[in-house]
Amino acid sequence: MKLNEIKTSKDVYRFIDDNIAYGWIDINNQQHLNTMKEFRRIYRTMSVEEILKYKLGTCIEQVNLMHYLLNKINVKNKMYCCRIFEPDDYGNLEEEEHMHCFILYYENGKVYHMEHPNLDRKGIYEYNSESEAIKAIVDYYIELRGGKESPTKEFFEVPVGISFKEFNKYINHV
């Protein structure tokens, strides 16, 4: 599927599934596919244009691309970040990151969760309400994180070119 062929929310998912891999570009413009090694040290967020150019993204970029594409076809949507809280000055660059961004969209009186970056849960999930969707998603990540609380916040944009630490700080203050 090509970008100009996207007409429906299912087309958005199909486009991302056909064209976007899980990965990221570092500060040296090197690609990292299916690995988070050195992520806290050298990751930077990408623009929508860069995501489309490199055909990859973490949950942050993939959700931002879904948001962009859903907006283009006038489908209401919201971006969220679910994570174990880290203060603004958190400095352990060796620790695994415990964050997942996701998107909900709204059609026909229902709420849908479009999941692509989490390879174990790829797909579109239907819910009766926003609160039901958020609870199901957050509960999944709390269980995955061994019961650790995972505060979830809506966010409205992805600043381009910032580090993981800076993105975390941005989410802290949204």
Segments predicted by a language model, with ranges:
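Secondary-structure boundary elements
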Residues: 1-54
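Charge-rich, solvent-exposed alpha-helical interaction surfaces
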Residues: 15, 133-140, 166, 170
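Mid-length scaffold segments of soluble, non-membrane domains
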Residues: 54, 58-61
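Hydrophobic/aromatic-rich core segments of domains that either
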Residues: 61-143
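Alpha-helical and coiled-coil interaction segments, frequently adjacent to or embedded
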Residues: 89-91, 142-174
